[in-house]
Amino acid sequence: MSNTILQNLPKGQKVGIAFSGGLDTSAALLWMRQKGAVPYAYTANLGQPDEDDYNAIPKKAMAYGAENARLIDCRAQLAHEGIAAIQCGAFHISTGGIPYFNTTPLGRAVTGTMLVAAMKEDDVNIWGDGSTFKGNDIERFYRYGLLTNPNLKIYKPWLDVQFIEELGGRLEMSQFLIENGFDYKMSVEKAYSTDSNMLGATHEAKDLEQLSTGMKIVKPIMGVAFWDEKVEIKPETVTVTFEDGVPVALNGKHFDNAVDLILEANRIGGRHGLGMSDQIENRIIEAKSRGIYEAPGMALLHIAYERLVTGIHNEDTIEQYRINGIRLGRLLYQGRWFDPQALMLRETAQRWVAKAITGTVTLELRRGNDFTILNTESPNLTYEAERLSMEKVEDAPFDPIDRIGQLTMRNLDVSDTRGKLGIYAQTGLLSAIKDSVLPQLGKK
């Protein structure tokens, strides 16, 4: 494994490159061809909301010198993994109760496996991509690539000293393309970087690295700038239906195709700016980073799913769902979505939690993450209003005498707890003085 990462261009050999059609990968592909490698270009169709013409990307790769260029449709698999993440609650990062839906890690899990599988079909066993050494993606792609092809070698132009010396910046790469006859005009550089797929968009870096720079500099690509009072956003009533843990209908319209359902959920949530969040997170290498995230469809489905979870399952099941979801979210973030420990947690949630989730949730969406749940319907609900009704109920499930007995049984653990607190007070762990949290503890 020590020779897995190649620090110099493998001349005369096939090199697969994850090709986006942007400046970096265009310049890298042309440079590799000129330096003697045989580049093969692979483009993932992940339903990116900011991509207009996927079919044009492989043609562009061929023009830059690719031996062959393929467009790999990853949307169905991405939809499948996105729904699995919702079923498991695989989201470990949140601020103020608003989660980051791990949309980039989900995209990397799909891209890293499906592109390398396509390379294997072409007998391409060297892979390059645009991830940098400071980020998470370099490790995610490394893991998923080697899981898919254990014989894979990794070559990244951005880790090659010669490439960096010759084409180390955007200006140098643009001039390189122009000098080689390509009419390349650099786009106006934004104040931040954006990466997206069908499930969500990530905005980070540059100006957003400063915590004093707020979300308002971001131009949403999956919805509206809900903070702008000039943007008219009308309240909207929406229904979301699940069957056996799978979202199947929106506003009464059934979808046989998960991709189409997610795209419609994006449109609905996007009209309100639902699912946008500002997060500080810990990267895989433990350094903190900051990102602004969009995920309107994931947010809509997650809200409805969790409402059904709380109405159907008991407290202990919900607790395990949440704890395991945090663990699984972190594994997903680290590029371990297909590791045994992740598969174990996924199977647990999908079998014992998701299978019972059948029903319809009605919501009113307003601006941003402001919403109201209007109704929750399910044949599997264990919520029954009459069980705890404050009104007099015929044939009540329990009466005052029953509760007296239940409370009397609590005397055992209350007595044990008081004894333990007394021990803690005697040893100095707790103070029994007047202003203490437990001022009366020392009294008999």
From Swiss-Prot:
Highest rank taxon of the organism: Bacteria
Binding site for L-aspartate: 132, 136-137
Residues binding ATP: 18-26, 44, 130, 132, 137, 195
EC number in record: 6.3.4.5
Catalytic activity: L-citrulline + L-aspartate + ATP = 2-(N(omega)-L-arginino)succinate + AMP + diphosphate + H(+)
Ligand binding (L-citrulline): 100, 136, 140, 193, 202, 204, 281
Annotated SUPFAM superfamilies: Adenine nucleotide alpha hydrolases-like (SSF52402), Argininosuccinate synthetase, C-terminal domain (SSF69864)
A single GO cellular-component term on record: cytoplasm
Record carries keyword Amino-acid biosynthesis: yes
Disulfide bonds: none
UniProt keywords, alphabetically: Amino-acid biosynthesis, Arginine biosynthesis, ATP-binding, Cytoplasm, Ligase, Nucleotide-binding
Top class in the EC scheme: ligase
GO biological process, one term: L-arginine biosynthetic process
Subcellular locations according to the entry: Cytoplasm
Annotated pathway: Amino-acid biosynthesis; L-arginine biosynthesis; L-arginine from L-ornithine and carbamoyl phosphate: step 2/3
GO molecular function, one term: ATP binding
Pfam family, one: Arginosuc_syn_C
Family: Belongs to the argininosuccinate synthase family. Type 2 subfamily.
Subunit structure: Homotetramer.
Protein name: Argininosuccinate synthase
Source organism per UniProt: Haemophilus influenzae (strain ATCC 51907 / DSM 11121 / KW20 / Rd)
High-level lineage: Bacteria, Pseudomonadati, Pseudomonadota, Gammaproteobacteria, Pasteurellales
